[in-house]
UniProtKB/Swiss-Prot annotation:
Possesses an unusual extended V-shaped dimeric structure with each monomer consisting of three distinct domains arranged along a curved 'spinal' alpha-helix. The N-terminal catalytic domain specifically recognizes the glutamate moiety of the substrate. The second domain is the NADPH-binding domain, and the third C-terminal domain is responsible for dimerization. Homodimer. Catalyzes the NADPH-dependent reduction of glutamyl-tRNA(Glu) to glutamate 1-semialdehyde (GSA). The gene is hemA. GO terms for molecular function: glutamyl-tRNA reductase activity; NADP binding. This is Glutamyl-tRNA reductase.
Length: 444
């Protein structure tokens, strides 16, 4: 379930983000919910949920899920989020991890945010095996997109685009900068600012984390916030706590102390870190300004990225199907092994051929007998024919194993060249001309 910058707008994203603390823990208390993970960024709030196979049969449908979310107080997400399921959800998650649905197309910051969200969900023990697996595979694919296309090389991040806009209004070379906040965006801002030749970076934190942050990032702590605001050429606000980092009163004092020099503020907080009304003499570049200024990506790079994602989704789907069928393959081998053991028990201890030699021979035969159907199981998983293989095993050998229902519909992956992304509507074969050389380099 997602609210994002493109569909619902940044205002709704900001409202939703303020309501999702503790949502994963609350949802996993429900007996029909196996796992939950919340991803909250400046672009979106995304809730990933795995329900039990019998959830719908027992009355736990979309409406019930939305009620659970609303009961936690996350009303904006419950009322406004778009819901996608199974295959569509997998595609969406892979695209989000690769930055394909970000405000800045192809940006890498979201991958780090998703990795931290997964770590937090694991710490809270709310993530199921399937959710953890799909997120890890999505992150792996996002790294391939970063290394095999030029999207990451273009510096396509929210921070970079924001500083590009600042550079159109002032000279960053030799500038004095105040960073208000100590989170991931603060770290990214310091790195970007250093690479652009600023003379001084000071950091301020209302939570008392500035000293440690300053040591780690080799910047200085702003001990007097009013003095720092008066002297700074640029202020970067990225606290995002819901309480403005720069109050209207502090901004007015800074304007008065600057004696006619305007104050430039780059506000990277989704909820807005500059209190309104913004006084005269203060110019704010916020996320909405950045969104409108994002440059278009090259079509060839976009196609290459889509092709890599399609390959990653297929690899994940096949791996999931193989794992689902593994108990049946084990059961087949156990049946053959039991037959061999039964025959060995019938052999006389004294015979023309030693029992050990007969046992070794029979076990080699058993391994050969198990190899072909095991290989067929792998082929069936790749072709979306897993259930047909399982039914054949039951019909021919009478082996029945309680196998979980497929997490995603494998039939859409039977022919990789005909796979269609439900988000973009693009087929893999449409992307292959320009993107195949890069995509084929992948071996894992």
């Amino acid at each position: 379930m997602t609210v994002d910058h493109a569909e619902q707008g940044l205002g709704v994203v900001s409202e939703a983000a303020a309501q999702v603390d503790g949502l994963g823990l609350a949802l996993t208390d429900h007996p029909q919910i196996r796992g939950a993970l919340v991803l909250s960024t400046c672009n979106r709030v995304c809730l990933i949920v795995e329900t039990s196979p019998e959830a719908v049969a027992q009355g736990f449908d979309e409406a019930a899920l939305r009620r659970c979310i609303a009961d936690h107080g996350a009303n904006v997400l419950a009322e406004s989020a778009q819901l996608v399921c199974e295959n569509d959800a997998v595609w969406r998650l892979f695209r989000v991890a690769a930055g394909m649905e970000s405000m800045v197309f192809g940006e890498r910051e979201v991958a780090g945010q998703m990795k931290r969200a997964l770590s937090e969900a694991r710490r809270e023990q709310t993530v199921s095996y399937t959710i953890g697996h799909v997120v890890e595979e999505a992150l792996k694919t996002s790294r391939h997109v970063a290394t095999e296309t030029a999207l990451a090389a273009e510096g396509r991040t929210v921070v970079a685009v924001g500083l590009d806009l600042v550079a159109q209004r002032m000279d960053l070379d030799g500038a004095r900068v105040l960073v208000m906040g100590t989170g991931s965006y603060a770290g990214a801002s310091c790195a970007q600012l250093s690479s652009r030749g600023v003379a001084e970076i000071q950091v301020h934190s209302a939570s008392g984390r500035a000293a440690g942050f300053a040591r780690r990032h080799r910047v200085s702590e702003a001990l007097d916030i009013d003095a720092a605001l008066a002297q700074a050429d640029l202020v970067v606000t990225c606290r995002g706590s819901g309480v403005p980092a720069l109050s209207a009163e502090a901004a007015r004092r800074a304007v008065d102390a600057r004696r006619g020099r305007d104050l430039m503020v780059l506000d990277l907080a989704i909820s807005g870190d500059v209190e309104e009304p913004v006084p005269a003499g203060v110019e704010v570049i916020d996320l909405e300004t950045i969104r409108q200024a994002v440059p278009a990506s090259a079509e060839a790079e976009r196609a290459a990225a889509e092709h890599i994602i399609a390959t990653g989704v297929r690899h994940f789907a096949v791996d999931l199907e193989r794992r689902r069928m593994a108990p049946a393959v084990v059961a087949l081998r156990d049946v053959i092994s039991d037959l061999v053991t039964a025959e060995l028990e019938r052999l006389p201890e004294e015979g023309s051929v030693p029992v050990d030699e007969v046992a070794a021979s029979l076990r080699r035969l058993a391994a050969s007998m198990a190899h072909i159907p095991s290989a067929r199981a792998r082929m069936a998983s790749e072709q979306g024919l897993g259930d047909r293989w399982l039914n054949s095993l039951s019909d021919v050998l009478g082996i029945d194993v309680d196998i979980a229902a497929p997490v995603i519909d494998m039939s859409s992956f039977a022919n990789a060249d005909c796979m269609t992304c439900p988000v973009t509507g693009l087929r893999v074969e449409d992307l292959a001309t320009d993107a195949a050389p890069r995509g084929e380099e992948r071996t894992s």
